[in-house]
C-alpha cells in the first residue's frame, strides 16, 4: 500500500517587476479587500486541489502562495489559476503565460523566504514587503482561506526575514522606492534652482507616509491631499516637525495641482486621480512622481511636465544598491539554510505527535491488562500503584531507543516513509481534523516586525 506523505506540497505563482510590464501589473493589482476576497473565493471554488491559498499584491509583484493536496498536478493548478486570473482581470492566458514564474516544493519555500527577506524586491533590503506579506497572510487567515500549512510557511518566512535583517544589515543602507524618488526630486530641485522647497503629496498610505518623512528630512514643506483628516492627525503625531506639514481634502485637488513644481502620488485608487482636464499651463516646469500601481496620474499632454513611474525609478535604484552585493550574498546563504531548517522543523512536527501517541498506546494497553489482572484477582488490589509504576518504567525503557531513533530520523528524507509505516503498523493514522486544534502552536506573529 502506498503511504501518503504528511509534508505539505507548496506552490507559488508569481508575476514581478522582473517578468511583467507596469501596464500588465496594473491590470493584476488588487486595490480593495472585497476584490481580494472574491479572488480567493473563486480560487477555492474552482481549484479543489488547492488546500490553502493567499494572495500578495504590491506595486512590483502579484503572487499566489498555496499548499496543494497530495497528488495534485502542479501543471493543472498553474493552468487553472491562469484561467481564473485571465477571466477575473480581463487578460489573455497566453499573455500571462509569458510572464508567470512557477515554483513548487523546496523552490517555492525558498522563493517565499527570498521575497519576505526583500531579496527579490526592486529595492533589495527594503522592509515594506515584510509588512505587506504579514497583511496578506493576516487577511487570508482571518477569512479562513489559509490554515496550518501556510501558517507554518509564513511563520518561518518572517523569522527568516528578521534573521536576514539582523545578520546582514541589508536594510540599514537607506534605499527604498520612496527614498530614491525623494533623492531624485532633490537633485531636480538643485538643478532647476527651485526657490521654495515645497512639495504636494496625494495620499496618506504607507508609501505616501514614507515619502513625506523623506521630504521632511530634506527640509521640504509638504501639503498632503487625502480623504481622512483623522488619519492625518494620527500621522502628524509621529513627526518631528509637524508644522511643516499641511492637510487638505483631495476634493480640493484642482486648487493645488497647478501650484507646485514637485508632486508625489501614492494611493490605492484603481483610477486616475490626476487628469489632464485639471491641468493648466504654468511658467515653471513640473516634476511628478507616480508611485502607485495602478498609476494615479494620467499621462500629461501639456509640455514641461515630467512624469516618473515606479519602473522609471529602477535605474536610479540600481545605482544606489551596488554596495549591497556582499550583504545580498550572505542573505541568500541564510535563506538557503532556512529552507533546509524549515523542512527539518516540519518533519519534527510530524514525529513528536507520533511519539506521544506511541507512549499513550503503551499506557492504555498496560492499564487494560492490569485491570484484567485485578478483576481476576491475579494480583492484590493494594499492589496496583506499584505495578503501575513498574509498567510505566518498563514501557519508558522499551520506547527509549525507538524515540531517539525517530527524532534522529525526523531530519532525513525517508522520515515520511518511517512515520507512515509506524502509524500504519500500530493503527495510529488519524484524520487531519486533529491538526486544526493545534493551529495556535504555529500561528504567525503577524503583528510583530
Swiss-Prot record:
Does rRNA-binding count among this protein's keywords? no
What does the entry give for GO biological process?
Answer: protoporphyrinogen IX biosynthetic process
Is Transmembrane one of the keywords? no
Kindly list the residues the record flags as site (Important for activity): 111
The active site is formed by 59 (nucleophile)
Catalytic activity from the UniProt record: (S)-4-amino-5-oxopentanoate + tRNA(Glu) + NADP(+) = L-glutamyl-tRNA(Glu) + NADPH + H(+)
Give any GO molecular function from the UniProt entry. Answer: NADP binding
Which residues does the annotation say bind substrate?
58-61, 121, 126-128, 132
Kindly tell me the pathway this chain contributes to: Porphyrin-containing compound metabolism; protoporphyrin-IX biosynthesis; 5-aminolevulinate from L-glutamyl-tRNA(Glu): step 1/2
SUPFAM superfamilies in alphabetical order: Glutamyl tRNA-reductase catalytic, N-terminal domain, Glutamyl tRNA-reductase dimerization domain, NAD(P)-binding Rossmann-fold domains
Q: Which domain of life is it from?
A: Bacteria
Where NADP(+) binds, per the record, is at 203-208
Q: Which PROSITE patterns match?
A: GLUTR
Question: What EC numbers are recorded for this enzyme?
Answer: 1.2.1.70
**Keywords from the named record:** NADP, Oxidoreductase, Porphyrin biosynthesis
As for family, the record states:
Belongs to the glutamyl-tRNA reductase family.
Which HAMAP family does the UniProt record give?
A: Glu_tRNA_reductase
Domain comment from the record reads as follows: Possesses an unusual extended V-shaped dimeric structure with each monomer consisting of three distinct domains arranged along a curved 'spinal' alpha-helix. The N-terminal catalytic domain specifically recognizes the glutamate moiety of the substrate. The second domain is the NADPH-binding domain, and the third C-terminal domain is responsible for dimerization.
Q: What more is known?
A: During catalysis, the active site Cys acts as a nucleophile attacking the alpha-carbonyl group of tRNA-bound glutamate with the formation of a thioester intermediate between enzyme and glutamate, and the concomitant release of tRNA(Glu). The thioester intermediate is finally reduced by direct hydride transfer from NADPH, to form the product GSA.
The annotated subunit structure for this chain is: Homodimer.
Biological function? Catalyzes the NADPH-dependent reduction of glutamyl-tRNA(Glu) to glutamate 1-semialdehyde (GSA).
Q: What is this protein called?
A: Glutamyl-tRNA reductase
The organism encoding this protein is Helicobacter pylori (strain J99 / ATCC 700824)
Recorded name of the encoding gene:
hemA
